[in-house]
Amino acid sequence: MDNLALCEANNVPLTPITFLKRASECYPNRTSIIYGKTRFTWPQTYDRCCRLAASLISLNIGKNDVVSVVAPNTPAMYEMHFAVPMAGAVLNPINTRLDATSIAAILRHAKPKILFIYRSFEPLAREILQLLSSEDSNLNLPVIFIHEIDFPKRVSSEESDYECLIQRGEPTPLLLARMFCIQDEHDPISLNYTSGTTADPKGVVISHRGAYLSTLSAIIGWEMGTCPVYLWTLPMFHCNGWTFTWGTAARGGTSVCMRHVTAPEIYKNIEMHNVTHMCCVPTVFNILLKGNSLDLSHRSGPVHVLTGGSPPPAALVKKVQRLGFQVMHAYGLTEATGPVLFCEWQDEWNRLPENQQMELKARQGLSILGLTEVDVRNKETQESVPRDGKTMGEIVMKGSSIMKGYLKNPKATYEAFKHGWLNSGDVGVIHPDGHVEIKDRSKDIIISGGENISSVEVENIIYKYPKVLETAVVAMPHPTWGETPCAFVVLEKGETNNEDREDKLVTKERDLIEYCRENLPHFMCPRKVVFLDELPKNGNGKILKPKLRDIAKGLVAEDEVNVRSKVQRPVEHFTSRL
């Protein structure tokens, strides 16, 4: 059999951009994009992407050139996930919530050939260019503005415009053949910068092959059927929308784009467009719960929600499902090209009590098909931990959907791939049924008197306490045990008023600590509760625990006697944003 050679017919490089061509041919009458009054079919989206790719090629943008974009969830942002790699270039989607200094640092590192930016961000663009030119007076970074597609715009002769590029593009048959035939599936398709919750963000290089396999694994793991209606509550800049930018094309789905994630907008779009799927971080659950919920009982099925980014407490999942959403938990990393674990529902779970079902659903789940293996290993011995749901270790993985590495950072790449695995830095356990469950980030583990305390486990208990909207638990200093848990809590609106706020919070803190003592081993219970109006979050909605740790460092843990008695005293309460 060794004499059977690879050829053009049986050795085609894998790339998710082929999903676009297939969608235009297989679903010609299907709506691809909805944005306000704008509607596109799949053939129209295909044509627009081909024209944009042709224009980029005419600007001498090609293989391995970086194309940066700062834009919200709009048709342009979606189209660029195809058009940029079709031109042979590498898409660099940038978090729109970053400030000019952070974006300038990314551009300085990525060195893009061109920058696309949403028109309403023009002041931000000018500030970014000023920062870049202050270091390099010879800088010549072309900027293309993306206007609101639903509204007329005036484009000066000196200004470049996204829609003009599409109109000018001339995709000849020769160019079209080139666009969908990449030479090497290991070539980069996307450059994604990590969220930077721990330190300076790193540039993650994703390959065509990795994106293709991760996309297929995601739509299979989520059991996404043909022609879904997908609501873009998750930013497309966040790990390419967890690969569903390409996944919706693979399924011939409809992308409902929305700029602002608010409860009224979400519920309006669900009703108006009969949305079937959406992704979000758990903080969006609180937006849904605080908003005026929609009666979804008349629908033929629930809205399927894939959530990740941080472990959602079972109590929170239960509340959201009662609104008419069917929640599936996933776990992933930018370095792994999106989700790598899906909590696949098992039929035997249907016979369990609701609370137990929610506990199982809150786990991270089983590995995607695109990975060779996921394991939980002792960081010191590199041996697999027992599958007992108790013994903690680091979550590691390997497979063809893993990143190529960090751009211009060989040291970080080496550390990430040490011991032949992608090391996640997340601490978890494996249950007897093979499901992985995150217990914490390694840096968030609290070590009290030599005992490891999972902040996530403590948070899960606090979330079950009435009127708790959000919580985060971090370490605070303790004179005897070194560290002890400190809980930061956001209460539901209206839980306290200005007149008796102080007294109520004192009572709340006392009751909450006592509740934890009834449901957790005493060494795991918070010695301090700090009430906030809002938890600090980064642009992706992840809670910024380093900021909370900074506050906790200045607090004093009480001894065991005072924890039990909880005498009346002023309660720490921080207002506004951190």
Curated annotation (Swiss-Prot):
Molecular functions per Gene Ontology: ligase activity
Tissue spec: Expressed at low levels in leaves.
GO terms, biological process: fatty acid metabolic process
Main location: other
EC number assigned by the record: 6.2.1.-
InterPro entries, A to Z: AMP-bd_C, AMP-bd_C_sf, AMP-dep_synth/lig_dom, ANL_N_sf
Any single Gene Ontology cellular-component annotation: peroxisome
Signal peptide positions on this chain: none
Motif (Microbody targeting signal): 576-578
Entry keyword set: Fatty acid metabolism, Ligase, Lipid metabolism, Peroxisome
Purpose of the protein: May act as an acid--thiol ligase that activates carboxylic acids by forming acyl-CoAs.
Family: Belongs to the ATP-dependent AMP-binding enzyme family.
PANTHER family per UniProt: ACYL-ACTIVATING ENZYME (PTHR43859), BENZOATE--COA LIGASE, PEROXISOMAL-RELATED (PTHR43859:SF25)
Protein name in UniProt: Probable acyl-activating enzyme 12, peroxisomal
